[in-house]
Amino acid sequence: PEHGNWITGFSFIDDSLYGDQSKLPDDLKNNKGHNVFYCMPLILGLIGLFWQAWYTRKRKVIKNGKEVEESLPIGIQQFWVVFFLFFMTGLAIVIYLNQTPMQPRERDYAYAGSFYAYAIWCGLGVLAIIDLLKKKAKLSGTAISAIVAVITLLVPIQMASQTWDDHDRSNRYTCRDFGQNYLMSLQEKGNPIIFTNGDNDTFPLWYNQEVEGVGTDARVCNLSYLQTDWYIDQMKRPAYNSPSVPITWPRLDFCSGTNEYVTVEPGAKQQILEFYKQNPEAAKKQFGDEPFELKNVLKYWVRSKNPDLHIIPTDTLYVTIDKEAVKKSGMMMASDTIPDKMVISLAGKTALYKGDLMMLEMIAQCNWVRPIYVALTVGEENYMNLGDNFVQEGLVNRITPFTTNKPGAKNFDTEKAYHNIMTRFKFGNLKQKGLYIDETTMRMCYTHRRLLAQTALQLLSEHKNKKAIDILKKADVEIPDYNVPIDYMSGGLDMARGWILAGQKQKAAEYVGKVWKTASQYLSYYLSLDANRFAQAQNDCIRQIMIMQSTCEVASMVDQKTAKKYEDQLNKLYTLYHGRGGQMPNAGN
């Protein structure tokens, strides 16, 4: 049930399908999307379906000189029309599209036509009941029609009463504000570029630029589209108040079918070094002064007129650093000294695709004059190994020439993050009680709460306690738990750690208690399932047990008595889990 599915509202049916519904965790039980129709629309539609298929009309005909009454099966003809509308816009589309599992969202909007067809049968169901009562009840046709209309009106009323609250987006401005927060995380000067990936990361930013006029000096670059020539053409043109992105390639070098991908062949590195050693002048003329300089690799290899050279001949690229440009760029100095070269590791990569090459081209050409960012929600598989050079500034990671994943290097600009969160961010009116937060919006709320918790922890590590407390209080006010429940995924334990380090253990205890309650409720629910469904929920059980273990660790920093109580509860639940054949990873081998 936590992943969707349907329920009837009748406990004897639902319990047999999905386990004891009374043991559902509170955040599922109280979710506004937890709707029950008691099968009323289904039953009404089936009544209409069968009535239409079997409907006949009486008529009198003369046979063998006698007047007789016969039935004409006219309903079946109409039935096939509606049925094929239902089939072709529903099941036929399912078969034709043959969608892969693990779709990013429910695709029910693709089958809207089949819902229209079934709605016709629901309407005919009303006629079917009227027709039946006219034959059985001793009432006038008008009275029967009125009574049936009133009774069957309960079906759409029930549907509306159940689904209205989880379709009500009024007073919720999260999409606009969260998109704006990404733009507000960017440097205010320098026409920054931000790489995004996917619809939910990109469209809110485009909306803010197009409609609200926010962040029009920035360029939003969607990595999913950057694989195509038409989108690269767009990036090479100015937009709003943003100049074109620094891509110098002529169109023939990135048009469709050209440089779709380029293999990474580190084995060629030694041969090139030997060539430079034996014949340096010829080598420099052919491949540039520095063979593995990013600009030279893109120019002399990837864009070579010789197709045999369309490779990346190394797994380590370099960008020579203009140190004065870095100092003027506005970025945080991640270490005491600016490196002579930026190192871009391609370790583990077998090929770079067109979008990757365009990212590298922008880095090679920008010379740190234009800040380049990657949205926090972009997966690491989409930006090569550039994460080694990130400095986080709010909801974005800034690409810098520094290697920031080594000891002693800074990878979080707390001053900019604090400024952005406290003065520039908006939170979509999440403070208003009663808002419906759907699954996708909830994920973005989680991202924001985790960001605030992470910022507070970073500030505390820098002994900036007052600013950290400001951030923690901001999270409590702007992302309240009555709209965005506190659990592990929403950053509940990080918030607790922040309050502990800030010296306010009572606030930390509130977060710990809520994380524990949610995790224990989920585990208890999984343990109540039948053997088959319990086996399917093994990974979910393991995840909740690990969350509870982490919660115990944080609880021990707050109150030993509470931590001991949690440990006892966890041991009891784990005993039940183990008794049903459950095992933790690597256990029992």
Show which residues each predicted segment covers.
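ER/secretory pathway lumenal C-terminal domains and tails of membrane proteins involved
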Residues: 1-111, 117-191, 203-589
